[in-house]
C-alpha cells in the first residue's frame, strides 16, 4: 500500500482509491483527492488533471457565490435591524424576500455556471472512456 500525505494531516492514504474530504469552509464542496497510480499513463494523467481542474473550478465558483451570499445577507440583516430596532429579529418572510432577490440577481451567473458545468463534464466523457479501456486491458494482462 502506497501513501500520499494530505496537506491537512499526516494520514496514510490507500492510493488505490479516490478520497473525499470534509466540506470546504467557503465553497461547502468536498475536496476529492483523486488516486494516482504508480504506473499512470499520460492519458490517465491528463484525465486526472482535467478532473482536478474541474473540481477546483467548481469549488472556486461556489466559494465566490457563497461569500457574496453571506456578505449580502449580512448587509440585508443589518439594514433590516436598523429599520426595526436592534432588539428585533429579521423574520423568515423578510429573509425569504432576500433569498428570492439574491437568486433573481444571480440568475444569469447561475445559468452560465450550469452551462459551463455541463460543457466541462460532457468533455470528460470521451477521455474517461479511453482511460477505462486502458485500465481494462491493464487488468486483463495481470
UniProtKB/Swiss-Prot annotation:
The keyword Mitochondrion applies. The keyword Repeat does not apply. Its main location: mitochondrion. It is found in: Mitochondrion inner membrane. InterPro entries: COA8. Keywords: Apoptosis, Membrane, Mitochondrion, Mitochondrion inner membrane, Transit peptide. PANTHER family: APOPTOGENIC PROTEIN 1, MITOCHONDRIAL (PTHR31107), CYTOCHROME C OXIDASE ASSEMBLY FACTOR 8 (PTHR31107:SF2). May be required for cytochrome c complex (COX) assembly and function, COX being the terminal component of the mitochondrial respiratory chain. Belongs to the COA8 family. This is COA8 family protein Y39B6A.34, mitochondrial.
